[in-house]
């Protein structure tokens, strides 16, 4: 108890005469992460206006309109991809050594829960596979050729391209490559 009452000047003179043990140096008690003996700190209010730190950019954010615009797969917020953009996406999945695969859906190409009701990534849709996965595919033009065949066979369907990792046995990428007219 007496050691906690020593002033810092007394400790300095004791230290000059002989080395002080580590326990002789007292530190002020801490409250949370800040010292209670530190200089006065200004406290910020935690109201809703102090949370956003991006200032004026908050006003330019937009909300996806839920009426009239369906949410599709990855990249669905972009305009329809051109043939060149699709080729670049397919080249990307080929560089990652993923197996390209095409799937199509005749009725619901958008997020729709039919067979599974819980929230999360899995939305209960089952798409039909177009032919077989393209094992050994090395060129995006092969995938785009199959995409054109699928469009001719099912012009009113949604068609997506999937990148499948056959080592980890997971689907790594999936995006809509074709939407029927009116979507």
Curated annotation (Swiss-Prot):
KW Nuclease (keyword) present: no
GO terms for cellular component: chloroplast
Coiled coil: none
BP-aspect Gene Ontology terms: photorespiration; reductive pentose-phosphate cycle
UniProt keywords, alphabetically: Calvin cycle, Carbon dioxide fixation, Chloroplast, Photorespiration, Photosynthesis, Plastid, Transit peptide
Transit peptide: 1-59
CDD domains: RuBisCO_small
InterPro entries for this protein: RuBisCO_ssu, RuBisCO_ssu_dom, RuBisCO_ssu_N, RuBisCO_ssu_sf
Top-rank taxon: Eukaryota
Location in or out of the cell: Plastid, Chloroplast
SUPFAM superfamilies recorded: RuBisCO, small subunit
Any GO MF annotation of the entry: ribulose-bisphosphate carboxylase activity
Task performed by this protein: RuBisCO catalyzes two reactions: the carboxylation of D-ribulose 1,5-bisphosphate, the primary event in carbon dioxide fixation, as well as the oxidative fragmentation of the pentose substrate. Both reactions occur simultaneously and in competition at the same active site. Although the small subunit is not catalytic it is essential for maximal activity.
Family per record: Belongs to the RuBisCO small chain family.
PANTHER family cross-referenced by the UniProt entry: RIBULOSE BISPHOSPHATE CARBOXYLASE SMALL CHAIN 1, CHLOROPLASTIC, RIBULOSE BISPHOSPHATE CARBOXYLASE SMALL SUBUNIT 1A, CHLOROPLASTIC-RELATED
Comment field (misc): The basic functional RuBisCO is composed of a large chain homodimer in a 'head-to-tail' conformation. In form I RuBisCO this homodimer is arranged in a barrel-like tetramer with the small subunits forming a tetrameric 'cap' on each end of the 'barrel'.
Subunit field text: Heterohexadecamer of 8 large and 8 small subunits.
Protein name (Swiss-Prot/TrEMBL): Ribulose bisphosphate carboxylase small subunit, chloroplastic
Source organism phylogeny: Eukaryota, Viridiplantae, Streptophyta, Embryophyta, Tracheophyta
């Amino acid at each position: 108890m007496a050691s906690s009452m020593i002033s810092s000047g007394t400790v300095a003179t004791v230290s000059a005469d002989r080395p002080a043990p580590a326990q002789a140096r007292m530190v002020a008690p801490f409250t949370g992460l800040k010292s209670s003996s530190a200089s006065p700190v200004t406290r910020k209010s935690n109201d809703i206006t102090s949370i956003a730190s991006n200032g004026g950019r908050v006003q330019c954010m937009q909300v996806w309109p839920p009426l009239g615009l369906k949410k599709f797969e990855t990249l669905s917020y972009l305009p329809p991809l051109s043939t060149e953009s699709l080729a670049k996406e397919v080249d990307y999945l080929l560089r990652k050594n993923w197996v390209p695969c095409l799937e199509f859906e005749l009725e619901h190409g958008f997020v729709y829960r039919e067979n599974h009701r819980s929230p999360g990534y899995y939305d209960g849709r089952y798409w039909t596979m177009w032919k077989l996965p393209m094992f050994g595919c090395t060129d995006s033009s092969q995938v785009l050729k199959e995409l054109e065949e699928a469009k001719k066979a099912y012009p009113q369907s949604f068609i997506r391209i999937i990148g499948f990792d056959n080592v980890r046995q997971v689907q790594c990428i999936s995006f809509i490559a074709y939407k029927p007219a009116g979507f």
